[in-house]
């Protein structure tokens, strides 16, 4: 029996056809993964394989960040798939980095969120990161400022202001992760944000947003009207 590839599917079911007709954003995680995998193996359709892998790993993120040996231990995956997926992940990260260094980060908040998610979501402890922006809101650099435990991180507003001055930043975006996976901000998150905003105001440095990164989700203080 031959491998069950996408080319054997009816057009109405083929992810490639759906992508060309409606765009990549119209596809589910499983459909995107099926395009990457190309074929299944005897008795298992490529779409079935994609769905099985997402169920086994728990999410697309956990699949893409899996250890090499763990990744290759799953039937249908191997060194070639691992190398290609890591290359795709790195290309996406470099694309975000390059774009944000040249464009206004606030013109495409979703891209900024994806970029910050790629920086923070793999951490098993809370990490507080700052994006330093110029007066056109282009990214100068990012810095992981503080690291904490699995449930909290201590943040010092003075240190953030000091680094902003070093970077000659006109504005900043704050971000930190919740290793629990739930992105809903805590009362402490709102309090420290207020403290950072007040510290930056004294030097006319704007805090444009504070993003809380969970597993597959992100909460923006700016979008909620908290800044």
UniProtKB/Swiss-Prot annotation:
Transmembrane segments: none annotated. The keyword Nucleotidyltransferase does not apply. Residues 105-227 form the MPN domain. CDD domains: MPN_DUF2466. Pfam families: RadC, UPF0758_N. Disulfide bonds: none annotated. A motif (JAMM motif) lies at residues 176-189. GO terms for biological process: proteolysis. It comes from the Bacteria. GO terms for molecular function: metal ion binding; metallopeptidase activity. SUPFAM superfamilies: RuvA domain 2-like. Keywords: Hydrolase, Metal-binding, Metalloprotease, Protease, Zinc. Zn(2+) binds at residues 176, 178, 189. Belongs to the UPF0758 family. YicR subfamily. HAMAP family: UPF0758_YicR. This is UPF0758 protein Spro_4842.
């Amino acid at each position: 029996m031959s491998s069950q590839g996408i080319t054997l599917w009816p057009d109405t079911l083929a992810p490639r056809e759906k992508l060309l007709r409606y765009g990549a954003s119209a596809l589910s995680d499983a459909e995107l993964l099926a395009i990457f995998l190309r074929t299944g193996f005897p008795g298992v359709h490529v779409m079935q394989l994609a769905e099985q892998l997402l169920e086994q790993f728990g999410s697309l993120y956990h699949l893409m960040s899996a250890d090499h040996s763990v990744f290759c231990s799953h039937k249908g995956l191997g060194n070639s798939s691992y190398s290609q997926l890591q290359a795709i992940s790195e290309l996406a990260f470099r694309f975000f980095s390059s774009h944000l260094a040249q464009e206004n980060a606030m013109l495409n908040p979703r891209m900024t969120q994806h970029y910050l998610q790629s920086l923070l979501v793999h951490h098993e402890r809370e990490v507080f990161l700052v994006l330093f922006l110029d007066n056109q809101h282009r990214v100068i650099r990012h810095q992981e400022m503080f690291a904490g435990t699995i449930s909290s991180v201590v943040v010092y507003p003075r240190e953030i202001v000091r680094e902003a001055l070093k970077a000659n930043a006109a504005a900043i975006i704050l971000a930190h992760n919740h290793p629990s996976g739930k992105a809903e901000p805590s009362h402490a998150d709102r309090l420290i944000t207020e403290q950072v905003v007040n510290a930056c105001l004294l030097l006319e440095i704007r805090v444009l947003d504070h993003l809380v990164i969970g597993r597959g989700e992100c909460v923006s203080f700016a979008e909620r009207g908290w800044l």
